[in-house]
């Protein structure tokens, strides 16, 4: 039996890729403009002869003029907004802060403008100028990078990669962390023995141990490699040969990645054997699956102060992931609308519908340690009740009057497009299933042909028990395109690819920082970024000011004063003023560096394996191909930064 898996953010989808590329260009463009400004200051401060030796005269001239043009385009919206206001074309009483597109969506560093409200018709044009400036900055940075990449030769990179591979094997850090795996062998003593929990426990433990051991090992190897070579001056044997500086970076990255990939494959095989031997046969039969779900959109309706509200009730919990509906009220319901269904649903005798909800109890006694009763109503695109609650009640009455043989109910579902199940027991946070008659999907091909606006399937859930509340979320109910015939073993290896993504990310970060920083500083900065990615959701809430109780300094004041998070503070006190101002500065900085932090949750697929959901390779949401695109999009700017840092580094330095 599976528990309920919470999916906080929307899945990665191919149809969102164009918008993601647009936002990526704006975000990277903001950093590119900032980098060009820093480079220009460096170019002015240093004598021309020094700059020529480091980056070359032609590159310096190109970047200088590109920086000036990017800054000119980027600042033009501010000038236009000021001119627009000074000419009296705006209402001075209506002024609101409007951010550039990338800062508005992604909080990356550039500028904020004050634009008159009446200047809204010109706003899109001003955003276009910001977008143009960011794209130009990216092009300016990429031109020298592309020229440098054209000189690379794979034979030299491969030779450096093999050298890095051999050096890493000889280092003690690899074997020291491998020895910690002995502790991992005793983890089964502390894992749950109930069959329904075993697979989740074993998969979670092995994934956690493998990921953190390999990540720490890889970060140490990559962070100290180039600084150690520079300190020992062994890098001179490489740079004196016809080798590009960037080839050293790529060789290190490729060599360490190959080594950690080999270790990951071995550990994944051993972990799979460990899971297979440790799990009892009952758990294997029940949980060794790789199901393919089909999700719908959720619409919750409740009654608040005698009126119908298009949202659920709050039960006072800190998490807002789920909305709640009351039992015994016909107008309180949760509706899942499936706007597209796979063609292979047609022709099936039955189709599994799985669900797992939260139960909030308002009374104790006979309801404790028991489930609640729910009513499930299924309506296809031909059913008029899908858009009219009165028709739904009428059809429900006809349906239950026709109740008798199971085939009669299936015939009713085929003719009327309506099927209802009452008295379905729902257990708190446990995944259960009911079978939906395939007659509801017989005309699916006709629906696709007609391109009807009506959804092919609507599922309505109501709680029948009084004095109880049912918590629902979008991903709590789904149809199964495949009930789990996909191999669990294949899914386990696909889940390990998520750990490989983590390794690629941290190796490139460490190598990039090590091109200009000492070994220990490179490792600290790399781990700070990585740990920020682990807690990126919390960091995002802090940066947006959505955390309860204020920022870090305000929270410290509340703890020291023994004040809860909802009580107002005395803002006239000097300590409170200082804390609030410190939080404003911290939030300002966090907003500007937020896009530097990787969203590691996007690469973690442990829950999918543990909860028995298939990890798609290419065409579905959250596929490995989509995650690979996301990884490349994050690593590419860091690779460009490593290119410039390595070219500007004085190799003779012993620091």
Spans of features found by a protein language model:
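Aromatic- and glycine-rich beta-strand/loop motifs that create alpha-glucan
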Residues: 151-174
